[in-house]
C-alpha cells in the first residue's frame, strides 16, 4: 500500500493544490470571494478523492461547456477503492483459487454493468419505455464501483494468462480489431472491456514500440494534468484557433507539464527500489 501511496498521492496533491491556487486569475470573482468557502471546500473534497462534492472552483471555467477543474480525477477514488479491496480479494484467492475468484468478480461486474445498462435503455426515469437513459437511476447505477471491477479483474486475468496469450499475439490483434468493429457498429459499447483489454495487451507486449521508460513514466502525470490544461486553453480562447494548431499546442503543454511533474515530484517520492525508477536507471546506465 505504501508503494501505491508514494506513486499516486504526491502528484495528485500537487496538481490539486496548484490548480486551486494558480487558477484564481481566471475566476470571475474578486480575490476575496475566490479564496472563500468554495475554495476550501474544493481543496478539502479533492484532496481526499471526493471530487464529486466540489468539482469546480468559484467563478472558474464558468463559460466552458464543463466547468469542472479536473474531471479526470473521478477515477482515482475508484482506484483507491480497488487497493483497499485487495487484502480481501487476496484472502479469498488463497482460499478458493485466484482464477476462480477473479472469474467470479469479472462475471459479477459484467452482470451489474450490462444489467443496469439494459434497464436504463428500457425504462425512463418516470417508468415510460424509452431509449434515452439520461438521468435514469439505472444509468447512474451502471457506472458505479461494482461495474468498474470488470476492468480490474480483466487486468489480473490478463496477467494470469500472460504466458499463454503471448503465444497467440497475432490472433489477439485480429480478435481485438473484430471486437472493436462489432462493438462500434452493433453493440454500442457493451463489449468495450474486451477490446480495451486486447489493446492493453497488444501495446504492453509489442516490441516495436520502443522503451520509453528510459525517459521516465509520464503516463500518470499526463492523465492528471491534461484536463486542467485543456480547460485553461479553452477559457483563454485557444479553442478558436485552427484545430491542428490547438492540438499541437495542447499536446506540447500537456507533455511539458507531465515531464516536469515526473522529475520534480513523482520520481522524488518513489523509493530507489521502485521499478519505475529502476527502468529509467537501467536504460541510462
List the predicted regions and their residue ranges.
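Membrane-interface helix-loop-helix regions
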Residues: 8-78, 194-199, 203
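Generic alpha-helical transmembrane segments of integral inner-membrane proteins
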Residues: 13, 17-21, 25, 84, ...
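Structural signal for the C-terminal ends of transmembrane alpha-helices
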Residues: 21-26, 88-97, 156-165, 181-186, ...
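Interfacial loop-to-helix transition and helix-capping segments at the boundaries
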Residues: 65-78, 114-151, 162-167, 180-200, ...
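Solvent-exposed interhelical
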Residues: 80-111, 159-171, 239-243
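Central hydrophobic cores of alpha-helical transmembrane segments
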Residues: 100-110, 170-180, 219-222, 250
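Alpha-helical transmembrane segments of multi-pass integral membrane proteins
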Residues: 177-267
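Membrane-proximal cytoplasmic C-terminal regulatory module of class A 7TM GPCRs
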Residues: 269-285
Amino acid at each position: 500500500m505504501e508503494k501505491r501511496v508514494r506513486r499516486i498521492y504526491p502528484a495528485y496533491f500537487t496538481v490539486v493544490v496548484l490548480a486551486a491556487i494558480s487558477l484564481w486569475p481566471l475566476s470571475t470573482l474578486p480575490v476575496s470571494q475566490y479564496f472563500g468557502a468554495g475554495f476550501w471546500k474544493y481543496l478539502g473534497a479533492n484532496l481526499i478523492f471526493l471530487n464529486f462534492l466540489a468539482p469546480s472552483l468559484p467563478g472558474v471555467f464558468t463559460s466552458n461547456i464543463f466547468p469542472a477543474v479536473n474531471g479526470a480525477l473521478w477515477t482515482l477514488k475508484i482506484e483507491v477503492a480497488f487497493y483497499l479491496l485487495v487484502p480481501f480479494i487476496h484472502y479469498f484467492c488463497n482460499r478458493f483459487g485466484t482464477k476462480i475468484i477473479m472469474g467470479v468478480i469479472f462475471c459479477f461486474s459484467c452482470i451489474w454493468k450490462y444489467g443496469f445498462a439494459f434497464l436504463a435503455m428500457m425504462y425512463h426515469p418516470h417508468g415510460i419505455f424509452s431509449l434515452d437513459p439520461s438521468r435514469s437511476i439505472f444509468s447512474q447505477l451502471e457506472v458505479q464501483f461494482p461495474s468498474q471491477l470488470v476492468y480490474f479483474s480483466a487486468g489480473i486475468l490478463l496477467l494470469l494468462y500472460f504466458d499463454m496469450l503471448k503465444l497467440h499475439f497475432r490472433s489477439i490483434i485480429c480478435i481485438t480489431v473484430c471486437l472493436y468493429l462489432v462493438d462500434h457498429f452493433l453493440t454500442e459499447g457493451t463489449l468495450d472491456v474486451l477490446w480495451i483489454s486486447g489493446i492493453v495487451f497488444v501495446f504492453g507486449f509489442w516490441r516495436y514500440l520502443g522503451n520509453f521508460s528510459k525517459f521516465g513514466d509520464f503516463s500518470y502525470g499526463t492523465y492528471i494534468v491534461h484536463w486542467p490544461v485543456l480547460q485553461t486553453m479553452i477559457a483563454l480562447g485557444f479553442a478558436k484557433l485552427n484545430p491542428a494548431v490547438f492540438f499541437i499546442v495542447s499536446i506540447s503543454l500537456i507533455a511539458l507539464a507531465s515531464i516536469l511533474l515526473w522529475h520534480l515530484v513523482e520520481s522524488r517520492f518513489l523509493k530507489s527500489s521502485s521499478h519505475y525508477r529502476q527502468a529509467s536507471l537501467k536504460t541510462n546506465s
